[in-house]
């Protein structure tokens, strides 16, 4: 057994904090059987054709680092601290990952790999071996309260595109439901059609909802994904207080990352619902009347919504409820669905790899013969649409909210 009781400083950097890893995680490092299932399903490994991006490689590297820093192993084996060059090479493999969780899904011994990668990124930040762009993420969020360093007062500007929007612009003092828009949908034109569609559906269905507007801050997922969990608390406190002031009993999210952050890292003060689940309930209650559409679609399960939150059925039920819409499943679907390349801050860290992963996803979708890829994530829509448009792929990408809005009678 490995003695992890003492973890010493790394070179000239700050001490490596052993509190970054739970006891469970340290034990799980010893449980790996080297089966390589993780490498077989990893979108980064398959797109880059680099075995060093696999979970297996990362785990072996982490074990060697921790063992080399522990007194017993250091004395017996003469283990040395990694050089700066070695640290730089290893660190790059850690950030060239979408945090899709597919490795965890197939692990035969049940290692919680996604949690381990988050802890590892936190460790890299604490020890000073993080990617340069990590500090940009931190600074953008500190200064602008959104990851893109945009003016937070413009967070609800997309409301201008809502058909017949009320004078209050969905900014009410009180409401039963808060719609938490998310940074991607608030600021990226390719994704802004999603909140527009959802707002029009909610309005047509008679839902009493409000936005937070400029009082909505980033949910904090980019911080968590970058290893910056230490900076998360102000965002959680602010967003909770903003929702409290609205008196809402329920919060809905079209962004799976926001949805999962609120479910796992926020105190449960209101009911947390993803937009696909909320739409399903509206359909079941007969509040969303559909007109027929002659359309063949395939469905892409977002990583955080599918593998992360286990929401698989709701979006499919909504799709199947629309007359004339035919759903053709991807070869790899539900918990086995392949990432689109948009997660884990990868687009910022390695845009070329992110694009190559998106290419593979688009190619897989084209093989189904579908005219449209439907998903339930604004970042997935943006990532796949960007690749499809740049490369003139003959397929459209649409969020579940956009599909429902397209079929809405009103």
Name each model-derived stretch.
Residues 9-51:
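Long, charged N-terminal interaction/targeting segments
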Residues 299:
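Hydrophobic alpha-helical positions that pack around
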Residues 3-24, 58-88, 313-324, 345-348, ...:
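Short, charged low-complexity linear segments at domain edges
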Residues 35-38, 100-103, 303, 341-343:
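Cysteine-cluster motifs in flexible loop/terminal segments that predominantly coordinate metals
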Residues 110, 185-274, 304-321, 326-410:
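Cofactor-cradling patches in redox/metallo enzymes
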